[in-house]
Amino acid sequence: MSLPNPFLIRPAPKKGKKGAPLVLLHDGGGTIFSYLQLGALGRDVYGIHNTRPGPTGVWEGGIAQMAAEYLDLIKTVVPSGPIIIGGWSLGGLVSFEMARQMAASAGSSSSSEQLQVLGLIMIDSRHPSTFTDKELVLPDSIKPAIRESIQHNMTQSRQLIRDYSTPSWPQGSQPPPTMFLRATRDLDGVPLPIQADAASSTRNGRMEGWREYEHDFIREVVEVEGTHFSIFEDQNIGELDKKLLAACKTLDRGVKS
């Protein structure tokens, strides 16, 4: 991929109030193609694509290694100050690990030199314990070389997710407040229940396995139309834009942790 990394998907408005920069990490296919369809979100929006794509790219250190490398990339465009991080599918998990690493290193430099994570945006990023092997069907129009790279990335990403154990947070801290954007339909297109059970009703919907995690960090579950693989398609992107913007604004304002 010839795009810069990170790639500025949408610039902040030249006039008026600007929100904290949003950095979206690639999905399991390793690309940021889906994010390129997003509209203006009132802030700089960056995308990070896989720095080790294709058959020769291997992440021996798993998601933790990926998060550390991408954090260094983020600091080349947003060296300090408030920031929102997140991503679709694998990207949400990597952003979660990235935030944990930042919490672990907090205090190693002055506050003026640190990034401040206002929150995370997970776009249908399931807890690894609920991961499914169902694959994305790629369109015939994709060039063979790109198809091969994406398929390799997807295979490796599935293994990375299987191997990732969601860690405990450093003592005295907890995960940043998180907005969970959840697909309304399962992978076969069947509508999912808005509320899975009484215990999840306080979060306005299913949390895709995160309710069992030791930290209560998901502040809101936002329904977005489509399946896991179709939420960025033309018929759904307009609604996703609106809900992603609203999620960013919620994190800009600050939510109770």
From Swiss-Prot:
Pathway: Antifungal biosynthesis. Thioesterase; part of the gene cluster that mediates the biosynthesis of the antifungal antibiotic FR901469, an inhibitor of beta-1,3-glucansynthase, exerting antifungal activity against the pathogenes Candida albicans and Aspergillus fumigatus. FR901469 is a cyclic depsipeptide containing 12 amino acid residues and a fatty acid chain. The NRPS frbI contains 12 modules responsible for the formation of the depsipeptide backbone which is denoted as Acyl-Thr-Ala-Tyr-Val-4OHPro-Thr-Thr-3OHPro-threo3OHGln-Gly-Thr-Orn-OH (C71H116N14O23). FR901469 inhibits the activity of 1,3-beta-glucan synthase from Candida albicans and Aspergillus fumigatus. With minimal inhibitory concentrations (MICs) against Candida albicans and Aspergillus fumigatus of 0.63 ug/ml and 0.16 ug/ml, repectively, FR901469 displays greater inhibitory activity than other 1,3-beta-glucan synthase inhibitors such as, WF11899A, echinocandin B, aculeacin A, and papulacandin B. SUPFAM superfamilies: alpha/beta-Hydrolases. One of its GO terms (molecular function) is hydrolase activity. It is an enzyme of class 3 (hydrolase). InterPro entries: AB_hydrolase_fold, Thioesterase. This is Thioesterase frbE. It comes from Dothideomycetidae sp. (strain 11243). It comes from the Eukaryota. Belongs to the AMT4 thioesterase family. Its EC number is 3.1.-.-. Transmembrane segments: none annotated. GO terms for biological process: biosynthetic process. Keywords: Hydrolase.
